Amino acid sequence: MKLWMESHLIVPETRPSPRMMSNQTLVTEFILQGFSEHPEYRVFLFSCFLFLYSGALTGNVLITLAITFNPGLHAPMYFFLLNLATMDIICTSSIMPKALASLVSEESSISYGGCMAQLYFLTWAASSELLLLTVMAYDRYAAICHPLHYSSMMSKVFCSGLATAVWLLCAVNTAIHTGLMLRLDFCGPNVIIHFFCEVPPLLLLSCSSTYVNGVMIVLADAFYGIVNFLMTIASYGFIVSSILKVKTAWGRQKAFSTCSSHLTVVCMYYTAVFYAYISPVSGYSAGKSKLAGLLYTVLSPTLNPLIYTLRNKEVKAALRKLFPFFRN
């Protein structure tokens, strides 16, 4: 889940009285502003989004198939990579079909139910990615810092339990946030200043009290953002310390190469999120929010397969074995 650091935007405001609300019509659909302020770039944006979405689906599906059907890739690192690829597919597929359709038809409305569904699946996949990146950092820590005990530390049962816990924990957390969103009333306006439905802009449109939602957002920020980030930093602190103790340059390079791909993905993901969502109130920008949304929902799922496979001989060998056209 992306860090909901825009919770600082949810400021106290005067809510309509029940009598006033009785004379208002509740919103049944929302308008996604998207990139409508730049209609001259519509064809260009559609082409770019279609290319990136196709690349994200193709890359992640190939990784999923390669790991699933190759027994040599059933190690913990690849098991977690399989889960990450699945999350990437869900994350980008929850928003890109609607975004592409809006660019083609210029029809940017989304039903209330569709918005809530999009919110649920996007938040579920994105929050699961944050937790999984932390789990993958621990896996690299175990492999580099405790190589002799790696097989016992990262047993099949333990890895399966971690992956299941990530999916279930994020599903429950997302259900809570979505449930709290469903209890709110939306009386208008109904324009979401983004190209997909997300929590903070929706809260700003609500004509109900959003206090409980705000509290839950702060708690989610603390866990998904701060705690996970610190745990990842701690894991890499131990990893770097262990690598520096290796006497030969070749040994240090080999040790670092086993975690360089994951470190690249972690830096890319957190940079995109922190860029837009950790900032003072006066520094908030809808443009920054849209850019960050593109980075972690479109660009990241597209680049992840490339980052994890370009320097991974095992994955490339599995792809060549599974798909003959890769041999050339």
From Swiss-Prot:
Its main location: membrane. Keywords: Cell membrane, Disulfide bond, G-protein coupled receptor, Glycoprotein, Membrane, Olfaction, Receptor, Sensory transduction, Transducer, Transmembrane, Transmembrane helix. It comes from the Eukaryota. GO terms for molecular function: G protein-coupled receptor activity; odorant binding; olfactory receptor activity. Residues 1-43, 94-117, 179-215, 277-289 are extracellular. Disulfide bonds join C115-C207. The chain crosses the membrane at residues 44-64, 73-93, 118-138, 158-178, 216-235, 256-276, 290-310. InterPro entries: GPCR_Rhodpsn, GPCR_Rhodpsn_7TM, Olfact_rcpt, Olfactory_GPCR. It is found in: Cell membrane. One of its GO terms (cellular component) is plasma membrane. Odorant receptor. Belongs to the G-protein coupled receptor 1 family. This is Olfactory receptor 13A1. It comes from Homo sapiens (Human).
